[in-house]
Amino acid sequence: MCWRPLCRFLWLWSYLSYVQAVPIHKVQDDTKTLIKTIVTRINDISHTQSVSARQRVTGLDFIPGLHPILSLSKMDQTLAVYQQILTSLPSQNVLQIAHDLENLRDLLHLLAFSKSCSLPQTRGLQKPESLDGVLEASLYSTEVVALSRLQGSLQDILQQLDLSPEC
């Protein structure tokens, strides 16, 4: 009889019995830190300072605006739209921000799971119909407006996380 697999299993079992779950406040702190990091990345892109998040730009109505009260579900949906818009932009400025948004959404899913919420699957959202046409006509404006509104939305999400948002 071969004892090696049994020994490996027992060694792994002893290790797993000491592993503890990450406290939810740690996940919430990581979420806030990532939001602040994304906001800093947006601030580092100099041309985003020229447009207000509240400014209306014709043809860019599909970019989410500010929402005063956000549930975890609404936060995730909003970030999914921004992620989709940013990944459609050819600019290298927004590539890391798009990846950060995916990580932020994963953290929001962990927060929702800790509250026994199940967030709807938003990974396969369809691209807004007008996005391709707008990108072709005004790539620069789309990037500036999207980043400006994303920054405002992230500030709202940061405030809502302190209020322990609902599902």
Curated annotation (Swiss-Prot):
Primary location group: secreted
Signal peptide region: 1-21
Keyword Secreted: yes
Keyword Lipoprotein found: no
Coiled-coil regions listed: none
Entry's Gene Ontology cellular component terms: cytoplasm; cytosol; extracellular space
Disulphide-bonded residues: C117-C167
Pfam families, per the entry: Leptin (PF02024)
GO molecular function: cytokine activity; DNA binding; hormone activity; leptin receptor binding; peptide hormone receptor binding; signaling receptor binding
GO biological process terms, semicolon-separated: activation of protein kinase C activity; adipose tissue development; adult feeding behavior; angiogenesis; aorta development; bile acid metabolic process; bone growth; bone mineralization involved in bone maturation
Key words of the record: Disulfide bond, Obesity, Secreted, Signal
InterPro entries attached to this UniProt entry: 4_helix_cytokine-like_core (IPR009079), Leptin (IPR000065)
Compartmental location: Secreted
Function: Key player in the regulation of energy balance and body weight control. Once released into the circulation, has central and peripheral effects by binding LEPR, found in many tissues, which results in the activation of several major signaling pathways. In the hypothalamus, acts as an appetite-regulating factor that induces a decrease in food intake and an increase in energy consumption by inducing anorexinogenic factors and suppressing orexigenic neuropeptides, also regulates bone mass and secretion of hypothalamo-pituitary-adrenal hormones.
Family, per entry: Belongs to the leptin family.
Name of the protein in question: Leptin
Source species taxonomy: Eukaryota, Metazoa, Chordata, Craniata, Vertebrata
Gene name tied to this protein: Lep
